[in-house]
Amino acid sequence: MTFLALDVGNTRLKWAQYEAPAVGARLLAHGAVFLENIDRLAEEEWSEMSPPTRILGCIVAGDAIKRRVTEQMELWDVVPRWVVSSPQEAGLTNGYEHPARLGADRWVAMIGARHRLLARGISKPCIVVMVGTAVTVEAIDASGKFLGGIILPGHGIMLRALESGTAGLHVPTGEVRDFPTNTSDALTSGGTFAIAGAVQRMVENITRHCGEPPECIMTGGAGWKMAPSMSVKYELVDSLIFDGLLEIASRRFAP
């Protein structure tokens, strides 16, 4: 019973095929394409893949992209299922005012992070950081309740906003410096420090609320860019959403 996990973000579609819809299942194949190229999946990357028995994905890219992805999966006789945030799943309690409005990628990443810690015998508060087109910073207490989270622009959105609203800021991407002395470095450093500062603030908030410092897990396509500038101890995990999808699938598709 092979299992296909899908993570459809704002920029790319990432996929991973596993031997089974179970935690710890062997990874058989994986890949990623930009959204403008998803219409080639059935003819290219997925054409030689063994047909999956189960498909589960999370998507934040909107209904038009979802339809295009679904069309590509018509080469298999399998109906994909999509994660919608719920009041509770896989041991995580959703503290959002309207649970279904929480982004599916945020929900799945938190489930992945929570179980990653539990598998190591760690039952502590946790901060989950996703660095992509947008940046999210989530807080989970030791009991597994999602307390709340923040959303801020990613590096690219910050720079484009400044370029469109300020004359003379169409400059090349710079480097992160403690004390930038040119506009390129000033812009890149400012965006990086804004994200790092948001994470630091959420760490302080949850430490005060829970009475102990949290674990911090970071993921996302641009997570590596943040790594050198983080002021808190963290773990960088590329596969966090796939980890969460496996946790959910192991329950939904249990024999």
From Swiss-Prot:
Residues noted as binding ATP in the record, renumbered to the chain: D7, V8, G9, N10, T11, R12, L13, K14, T133
Gene3D superfamilies per UniProt: 3.30.420.40
UniProt keywords, alphabetically: ATP-binding, Coenzyme A biosynthesis, Cytoplasm, Kinase, Nucleotide-binding, Potassium, Transferase
S-S bonds: none
Catalytic site: D105
Swiss-Prot/TrEMBL catalytic activity: (R)-pantothenate + ATP = (R)-4'-phosphopantothenate + ADP + H(+)
Pfam family, one: Pan_kinase
Pathway: Cofactor biosynthesis; coenzyme A biosynthesis; CoA from (R)-pantothenate: step 1/5
GO CC terms of this entry: cytoplasm
Cofactor: NH4(+); K(+)
Matches recorded under CDD domains: ASKHA_NBD_PanK-III (cd24015)
EC code: 2.7.1.33
Chief subcellular location: cytoplasm
Free-text comment on the cofactor: A monovalent cation. Ammonium or potassium.
Cell compartment(s), UniProt: Cytoplasm
Enzyme class, spelled out: transferase
NCBIfam families: baf (TIGR00671)
Subunit structure: Homodimer.
UniProt family annotation: Belongs to the type III pantothenate kinase family.
Role: Catalyzes the phosphorylation of pantothenate (Pan), the first step in CoA biosynthesis.
Protein name: Type III pantothenate kinase
Origin species: Polaromonas sp. (strain JS666 / ATCC BAA-500)
